[in-house]
Amino acid sequence: MAPLSPSRRSVLFFVAFFVVAIFSPLCRASTGDELPEFKNCVQACIQQECDVDSPKSLPLHLQLFLWTCPSECDYVCQRHVTHDRIEKGQSIEQFHGKWPFYRVMGVQEPFSVIFSILNGIQFYRGLQLIKREFPNTYPPKGIYLFGAYVGMAAWFFSTIFHTRDSIPTERLDYFAAGGLVLFNLFYAPLVIFRPFNSTPMSRSEQKFETWVYVWGIICTVAYLSHVYFLQFVRFDYTYNMAANVVVGLCQNVLWVYYSITRYDKEKRPWAFWPGFIVVWMTCSMSLELLDFPPLFDALDAHALWHAATIPVPMWMYRFLVRESKDDIYGKRLKM
């Protein structure tokens, strides 16, 4: 067998590292739920505070975030058991798949909320950049604008989920995140292969080659089928993660291919930007491997992952603006 070229070795490295970074966290299980002291604490709290004629009323700010007497008991017991384990020199355990974060004004994961908001703001900035830099006659402009809205929606639902974890907020977060991942795969071939006429055209002219519309239908059907399965057949965490990993791998391979081939053809340094973003995102996701107990009871590896993704949207939008210049000014060399 002939040895692999450096470019192919690079692609395989990114693929392997991405898979390890994503799937390794799935190997860890939450054990705090099964601790006898936690179960006994929750049971006693509910009996004494909730299953009574006049249950204790929660503060208004907790009620606004849909905290109930049983969920308050669960939170209080998490904090109590964790404090006792620290005092005894025992390890901190996760509860319901999460670390026992210190709640701030009813917000469960304050740092993840802050970083999710900042990510959403970056997509809003990208939206304004697209509106300002792309002429209306540039065919992909509408797709890029739609992508910015998808990104803002994804981080909005991430903010809601990290504010208050519940089945509805969790599923909205997962569905929106999956939509963003799949949309990123949808538009990657449009940037790489440019199946459109960049010169001004009449409204009756077809903006893109036919395969783009077919590709869009395939992505839409795949997304709707994915959501339908999770919502109405079985909400399978492993399947959901695997689906997102496969889609993410596909787009990462495409972007690495773009960076290598584009730079080889035109020797333009900015052609490496997508490849750099792939490396950055892969390393950022590897933060999940750390999965340490939260610093200050609030900052964990998952929150740091969200922090690491904050600059990525604007990096990508600035790349799209720079990449489109040759299209807009008629200097494009077809790949």
Regions found by a protein language model. Name each.
Residues 5-11, 142, 211:
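N-terminal membrane topogenic signal
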Residues 2-6, 335:
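C-terminal regulatory/interaction regions
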Residues 24-335:
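Multi-pass alpha-helical transmembrane bundles in non-GPCR membrane proteins
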Residues 8-29:
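Cleavable N-terminal signal peptides of Sec/SRP-targeted secreted and luminal proteins
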